[in-house]
Amino acid sequence: VTDTKATETTDTAYPAAPALSNAEVAEHDISHVFHSWSAQAKLAPLPIKTAHGSTLVDFDGNEYLDLSSQLVFTNLGHQHPRVIEAIKQQADTLLTIAPAHANATRARAAELILSHAPEGFAKVFFTNGGADANENAIRLARLHTGRDKVISRYRSYHGNTGAAIVATGDWRRQPNEYATGHVHVFGPYSYRSDFWAESEEQECERALQHLEAVIKGEGPDTVAAILLESIPGTAGIMVPPAGYLRGVRELADKYGIVFIADEVMGGFGRAGEWFAFQA
């Protein structure tokens, strides 16, 4: 015998949300939500109700073109039907699982990623986000080399957690520079060259000379990792000159340093190849 009352669900269990205006949503948001990287007394967020493709729609029915793909992560556009369907199917099967267990979906995702990775990549370490990925990459580099220092660039962004924010190369790291062992260098930027370069080739050569000088100055046997965005994103889409990333790879190999390519913004097809360092 089945108790129909015990299993019955009704539409009244989750009543539909009332129609809201931009002004109402903004008021509630500002009152209750802490916005990162923002002066809380000066918040003026744009309320967004839904989106499709590259179009955002607010609560008053106005449409906007999403030129930044949010934080450069909506590669396939908003509300792509195949993505939504895949999320629904996985939610019906299993919502979450501890990392100690095996899971077919996660294993298949890792297999697909590795099928597009260059030779030498054997496993995928899944994390919750970019800062988390960089934190773990730094820890792995230090464990692998037995060294401490991490060299990263000015005009960079690597996340807002302990070591990631200190590796970040803009002023926002300064109130919280508690992680140790971080050194910054200038990267190539032909538009406002720090090396008085007159050509892309010269900019590349001098930026690599500068990086090697810092490695030598800090002591090669103290440097665990070079952490770079393949294409700096938050500081401006600064595409490196031809040969720069290859030169960094050669310096890392020369001194036994781990090269960490932060591609949270630049990877997975955004630069024309699966990984930006291949472009």
Language model features with spans:
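Conserved N-terminal phosphate-binding loop of PLP-dependent enzymes in the Aspartate aminotransferase
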Residues: T2-A279
